[in-house]
């Protein structure tokens, strides 16, 4: 009675004395659902959410029901009432409740929404009670929710279930007697396998490889360098990679390819410099240079002009002398007398006597390099082989005379000495002989003629331009040549500003073959 007053009940159930609620129960069967705590409604709603049980409960609620009269146990005759008054909720209304699930907050349940709607509907006597809820759950065979209401709301025993069917009770407890009967095993039973049978089964399973939890993996090592036997019986050959060149050889090839263009580009300059006489060994006063020049190889930088004359036979090499005068100039080059000694090889002095047409020249060695003669003599004897050769170069060192008797004289018609400013070391003569067959007899008869006729154009070309030498201090060289009664001067500018290359120092070979 006090519990009913506390929950707001206006009328107390007075049907019979047996329906009295125990004093310690939380709710009575006549307690309206709107008076039940929200926490208890929430727990009940979580059970009804399983498998959509709330739809089954909502579909069997009667339309008009005297809740207070039907709250007692067994007082609700559902079949008669449902046929008389009908159902309260239709399928469309159930779908509306189902549509609210999308708008629910995380703490709400759709079954709770259904209970909230049901407990607040109807008149005073038509509002649902805990007793009506328990009887409808049993009629809908939702026994899990019915057990929760009987135990937690009313403190009553669980409602009875049918003995058969899905709603029948399923016991999960095992009786000790039943368990002992199931666990009894005879010692001499034939179905118990022995050790030999177990080992045989293991061996059989190992052979078939069936139902193995683990297995041993044995790796077979193979030497890949040895050809393996194939299935068809033939042996496969091991592929051998091609030999690879060593790193050092590849570097050498790369270096050679890089050096080759440089060598080719430097070749023209080397050919030009090799054709210039090495004037550093022309100083006869240095004995060291003379000795070293004898040991070096003879550079064949001057063409062998003696073989260019097809009409001449074996030409003997010698040195001829022709009077030359150094031009008057402060920078005039030192005059030198060419008296080169010949060895077995062809001398390096161009055979200018071959330049005259139809000439068959024979060059004789001058016996004395310091003697200035007005008559060129030709001998047919081979020069002394023991004479020292300065690298097959013109014996220009003989022009630097250190003796006092080496004063230069010029003989000829109208030839006059112009070396007044030259000392003994800078004075000298360069004798050139260019006699043809027709002039030999005239030269023998005329002893007064000291100078041999030389063609002007050929002499200019054939004379070596020694002013291009690195050791020649003179940048301007003037040479005076005498031909018969005429004399002419040849000036060669070898200054650093000149554009002449070394090729101007080589005789014009196109004019040699006449």
UniProtKB/Swiss-Prot annotation:
Superkingdom of the source species: Eukaryota
Localisation per UniProt entry: Cytoplasm
Region (Disordered): 226-250, 255-274, 324-343, 366-385, 413-514
Entry keyword set: Cytoplasm, Developmental protein, Repeat, Transducer
GO annotation terms (biological process): signal transduction
A cellular component term, taken from the record's GO annotations: cytoplasm
Tissues expressing the protein: Maternal and zygotic gene product.
Compositionally biased region (Polar residues): 422-433, 477-514
SMART domains named in the record: DEATH
Ranges of biased composition (kind: Low complexity): 259-274
Compositional bias segments (type: Acidic residues): 434-460
Pfam families per the UniProt record, alphabetical: Death_2
UniProt key word Cytoplasm: yes
Reported function: Required for the determination of embryonic dorsoventral polarity. Is involved in transduction of information regulating nuclear import of dorsal protein.
Protein name: Protein Tube
Organism: Drosophila virilis
Gene name as annotated: tub
């Amino acid at each position: 009675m006090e519990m009913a007053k506390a929950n707001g009940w206006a009328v107390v159930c007075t049907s019979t004395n047996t329906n009295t609620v125990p004093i310690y129960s939380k709710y009575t069967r006549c307690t309206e659902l709107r008076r039940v705590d929200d926490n208890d409604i929430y727990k009940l709603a979580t059970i009804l959410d399983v498998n959509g049980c709330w739809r089954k409960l909502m579909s069997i609620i009667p339309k008009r029901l005297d809740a207070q009269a039907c709250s007692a146990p067994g007082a609700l005759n559902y079949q008669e009432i449902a046929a008389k008054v009908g159902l309260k909720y239709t399928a469309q209304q159930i779908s509306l409740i189902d549509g609210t699930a999308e708008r629910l907050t995380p703490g709400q349940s759709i079954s709770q929404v259904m209970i909230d709607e049901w407990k607040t509907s109807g008149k005073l006597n038509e509002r649902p009670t805990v007793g009506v809820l328990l009887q409808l759950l049993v009629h809908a065979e939702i026994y899990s929710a019915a057990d929760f209401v009987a135990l937690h709301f009313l403190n009553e025993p669980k409602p009875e279930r049918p003995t058969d069917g899905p709603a029948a009770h399923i016991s999960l407890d095992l009786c000790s007697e039943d368990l002992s009967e199931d666990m009894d095993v005879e010692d001499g039973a034939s179905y118990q396998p022995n050790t030999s049978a177990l080992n045989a089964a293991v061996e059989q399973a190992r052979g078939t490889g069936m139902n193995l939890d683990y297995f041993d993996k044995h790796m077979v090592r193979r030497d890949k360098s040895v050809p393996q036997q194939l299935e068809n019986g033939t042996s496969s050959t091991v592929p051998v990679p091609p030999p690879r060149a060593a790193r050092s050889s590849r570097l050498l090839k790369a270096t050679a390819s890089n050096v080759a263009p440089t060598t080719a580009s430097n070749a023209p300059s080397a050919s030009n410099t090799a054709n210039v006489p090495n004037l550093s060994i022309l100083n006869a006063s240095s004995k060291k240079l003379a000795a070293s020049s004898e040991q070096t190889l003879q550079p064949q930088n001057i063409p062998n002009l003696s073989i260019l004359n097809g009409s001449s036979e074996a030409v003997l090499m010698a040195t001829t002398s022709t009077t030359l005068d150094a031009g008057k100039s402060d920078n005039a080059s030192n005059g030198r007398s060419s008296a080169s000694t010949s060895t077995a090889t062809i001398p390096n002095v161009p055979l200018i006597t071959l330049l005259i047409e139809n000439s068959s020249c024979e060059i004789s060695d001058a016996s004395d390099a310091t003697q200035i003669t007005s008559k060129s003599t030709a001998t047919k004897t081979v020069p002394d082989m023991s004479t020292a050769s300065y690298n097959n170069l013109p014996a220009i060192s003989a022009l630097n005379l250190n003796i006092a008797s080496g004063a230069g004289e010029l003989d000829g018609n109208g030839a006059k000495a112009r070396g007044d400013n030259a000392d003994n070391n800078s004075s000298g003569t360069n004798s050139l002989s260019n006699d043809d067959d027709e002039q030999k007899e005239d030269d023998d008869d005329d002893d007064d003629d000291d100078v041999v006729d030389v063609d002007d154009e050929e002499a200019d070309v054939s004379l070596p331009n020694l002013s291009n030498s690195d050791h020649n201090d003179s940048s301007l060289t003037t040479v005076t040549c005498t031909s018969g009664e005429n004399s002419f001067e040849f000036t060669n500018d070898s200054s650093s500003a000149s554009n002449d290359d070394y090729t101007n120092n080589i005789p014009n070979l196109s004019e040699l073959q006449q």
